[in-house]
Structure formats: structure tokens, C-alpha cells
């Protein structure tokens, strides 16, 4: 489904299905990566939903936080150099723990929320400029798994077996159909490029189809607030019986819940079940990693105010709260910082206090000036990268933040626990 009204001028409503004929028009400029869309449309997405380009260096920084936690050391895949990085070319060495082998790394389940074109999963191009990134320098979570498979297999059959498992462990969802299509294409093209890079041949049709089927399950369309297919409902007819006949029929509309695949157990499961501890007699599936740059806000009014603006509400906090429920490992999200740190904004006081006192909270990286990260204007209260570790063995008393970094020393701030916020200026 389109899942957006952006294509109404082309004759496609949000509830319309994206047909094969439309997909054939991908090259005809019907569906485009965000970098190729008009500046007006980009600004509209930013204004309505707080949707912004996530530069590749930020994706790399967040992905590095995840891998630092997994490996127990820094700079495993690359070294960050400001807004660039230098790829490490030596063979990746794994810890001696049985739970930290290269095969365990491949099977680690990793989800990008509100994935857009999936820049955290695969980095075929710089999302801000559209410039291609050479294969060996890519920084996505799937890119990293492919590198590990390349370094630990010696024949194409074993390689393909573990590439399949790598794809089965990478997930992403988005509400907009055009984003889902582009994300799927990026993952599929990454497989083709990986085969060419490692084995100097193109994959067979059957090899491509098998990967494509996995992608069609693992990159899916979903409304994050209902965990259901956007714009779709089915009718439920309720019939009340009296002594002689049925009467009082009523019809209600119910959303269609989304399902995903648990490949290791070879079964589909409702997304809702991820929130449970147990499901159908077994431990419910949880993600080992959740990462992303969720939407920050949504418009709540159709009419503009006198100053030409529309009322909006914060929504980024809901993505953090839901991620906390379905992850058993690392969560690294980026969203506006000042409004929750200083409890400004409806519904953010409770969220801010709970967040800052969460014993799973490990690190905050704060940029007071959002333009240090994003080129789009409109985020006035700074940007925070928030890292939590939901592993039950990682809890620490007090929920004290280990790092609170700013690129503007004159506006340095830090927070401490105990249910209140304290700003420390120029320390």
C-alpha cells in the first residue's frame, strides 16, 4: 500500500495497493529515493513528521555503539573521523565467549524502526548526497554481517548458507509503501553486489528469489502505533440471538495485525507477541538490537493557525517506549534532546524522568545544535543519541548517564539521577 497521500496528484491514494505495473514505473520517476524528491516534498515530510535525512556518519556512529557492546571493545569495523570513517581492513577477531562467535553474530536479530530506505541496515549510498559508497567501506548492520561471512567462509555454498541466515536476522518496518519498496530494493541489490564482490559472478535466479522471499517478510509495512497494516481494516459482523430469530446485526471495523517470521523456529508470529514474555508456551521472540531515527512529531490539525503553522505533537517517545518492550539487548535511537531532557512538551515530563532514571540507560550523546547532525532546519532543541542495554545483567543502580557529550563547550550540560534535572554550565 502507498500509506501516504504524497502520490494523490499521480492518482494514488494512501489506501491504494502499489501494483506491479507501478513498480515497473520505478525507473519512470513514480517512486524515488528521498534524495531525488523535490525540496518542497522533503520539507513537507520534515514539517509533518519530523522526518529528516540520517547522514551515514550518524548511522555508523549508532551502529558502532551496538558493536562495541557486542564485542566489548571499540573500533571493530572502522574508526570514526569526525563525519567520516576509516575502514579497518584486518580480519575481525571475536571474543572467546561461546555466546560471541561469528555465527552468533550472524544470527543476532537486529531491527531498524521506521526504516525509510534502510540506511542503518545497508549503506549503498550516502543518504544525504546520494553518492555511492564502495562495498568495502559500507557500515550498515547487514553490511557488517556480510563482511563477517566473507571472512569466515571459503566456498560459495557455505557462504550462501550464512548469507541467508544474515538476511533472516535483519528486520525493518515503515508505514510508507514507497520507503518499504526502496528499502527492499537496497537489501536485494546489496546481495547481488555481495555475490559479485566475493565470488566475481552474478547470483542465479533461484539464489535471488530465495533472498527476495526473506526480504519480503523481514522488511514490512506497518503502522507502529497499531502494529497493523496501515489504511486497512476488515469488517466484523456481530449477530445477537433472541428466542425466535437473529437480529440487531452490527458491523465494526478491525485493523489487520502484522506478522513477521521467526526463521530459527520456522514460524510466523504476530508483532504484538514480541511484547510478551511467553507466547504459545515458549519464550517470545525478542530483538537483540533495535536501532533507528524514528519520526519526531505528527500534525494534529488540518487547518493552519494565523502564523501559517499547524499543531503538532511529539511521537518519538513512543518509539523508545515500544522498543524497550521488544528488545533484550542494545537499543540506540536518535531523536530531539532538549524537549525530553528539560521536560518541555506535552507528555514529556513523565517520559523524561523515567528515561533518565532507567537503569538500562547507558549513554547519551547530545548535540545542542541540531544542524551539526541534520541539514534540514526545524529542530530547535538539539539532538540526542540514546543508548540503552536491556540485558538483565547490565542493570546498574541509579541510572546515572555514563557520557553526556556536546560539541558546544559553552553550552555544556549534564544530567544526574534522583528524579530531577540539573544543568551544569561551562564545567
Task: Describe each PLM feature range.
Residues 375-427:
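Long, internal scaffold/assembly segments composed of regular secondary structure
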Residues 1-365, 369-373, 385, 389-402:
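SAM-dependent methyltransferase catalytic region
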Amino acid at each position: 500500500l502507498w500509506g501516504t497521500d504524497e502520490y494523490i496528484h499521480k492518482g494514488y491514494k494512501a489506501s491504494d495497493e502499489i501494483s506491479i505495473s507501478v513498480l515497473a514505473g520505478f525507473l519512470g520517476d513514480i517512486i524515488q529515493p528521498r534524495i531525488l524528491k523535490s525540496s518542497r516534498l522533503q520539507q513537507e515530510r520534515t514539517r509533518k513528521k519530523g522526518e529528516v535525512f540520517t547522514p551515514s556518519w550518524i548511522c555508523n556512529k549508532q551502529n558502532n555503539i551496538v558493536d562495541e557492546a557486542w564485542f566489548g571493545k571499540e573500533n571493530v569495523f572502522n574508526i570514526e573521523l569526525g563525519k567520516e570513517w576509516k575502514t579497518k581492513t584486518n580480519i575481525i577477531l571475536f571474543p572467546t565467549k561461546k555466546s560471541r562467535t561469528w555465527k552468533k553474530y550472524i544470527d543476532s536479530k537486529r531491527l531498524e524502526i521506521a526504516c525509510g530506505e534502510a540506511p542503518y541496515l545497508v549503506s549503498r549510498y550516502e543518504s544525504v548526497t546520494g553518492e555511492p559508497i564502495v562495498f568495502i567501506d559500507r557500515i550498515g548492520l547487514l553490511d557488517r554481517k556480510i563482511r563477517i561471512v566473507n571472512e569466515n567462509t571459503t566456498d560459495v555454498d557455505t557462504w550462501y548458507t550464512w548469507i541467508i541466515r544474515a538476511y533472516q536476522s535483519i528486520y525493518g518496518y515503515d508505514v510508507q509503501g514507497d520507503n518499504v519498496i526502496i528499502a527492499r530494493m537496497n537489501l536485494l541489490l546489496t546481495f547481488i553486489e555481495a555475490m559479485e564482490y566475493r565470488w566475481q559472478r552474478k547470483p542465479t535466479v533461484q539464489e535471488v528469489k530465495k533472498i527476495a522471499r526473506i526480504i519480503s517478510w523481514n522488511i514490512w509495512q506497518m503502522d507502529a502505533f497499531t502494529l497493523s497494516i496501515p489504511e486497512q481494516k476488515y469488517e466484523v459482523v456481530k449477530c445477537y440471538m433472541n428466542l425466535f430469530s437473529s437480529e440487531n446485526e452490527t458491523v465494526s471495523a478491525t485493523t489487520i495485525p502484522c506478522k513477521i517470521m521467526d526463521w530459527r523456529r520456522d514460524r510466523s508470529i504476530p508483532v504484538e507477541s514480541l511484547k510478551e514474555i511467553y507466547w504459545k508456551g515458549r519464550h517470545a521472540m525478542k530483538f537483540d538490537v533495535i536501532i533507528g531515527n524514528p519520526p519526531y512529531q505528527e500534525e494534529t490539525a488540518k487547518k493552519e493557525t494565523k502564523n501559517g503553522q499547524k499543531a503538532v505533537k511529539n511521537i518519538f517517545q513512543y518509539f523508545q517506549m515500544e522498543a524497550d518492550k521488544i528488545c533484550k539487548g542494545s537499543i540506540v535511537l536518535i531523536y530531539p534532546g532538549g524537549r525530553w531532557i528539560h521536560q518541555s512538551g506535552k507528555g514529556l515530563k513523565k517520559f523524561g524522568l523515567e528515561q533518565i532514571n532507567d537503569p538500562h540507560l547507558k549513554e547519551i550523546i547530545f548535540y545542542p545544535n541540531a544542524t551539526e547532525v541534520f541539514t534540514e532546519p526545524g529542530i530547535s532543541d538539539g539532538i540526542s543519541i540514546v543508548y540503552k542495554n536491556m540485558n538483565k545483567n547490565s542493570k546498574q543502580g541509579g541510572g546515572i548517564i555514563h557520557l553526556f557529550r556536546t560539541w558546544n563547550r559553552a553550552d555544556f550540560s549534564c544530567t544526574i539521577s534522583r528524579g530531577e534535572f540539573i544543568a551544569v554550565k561551562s564545567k
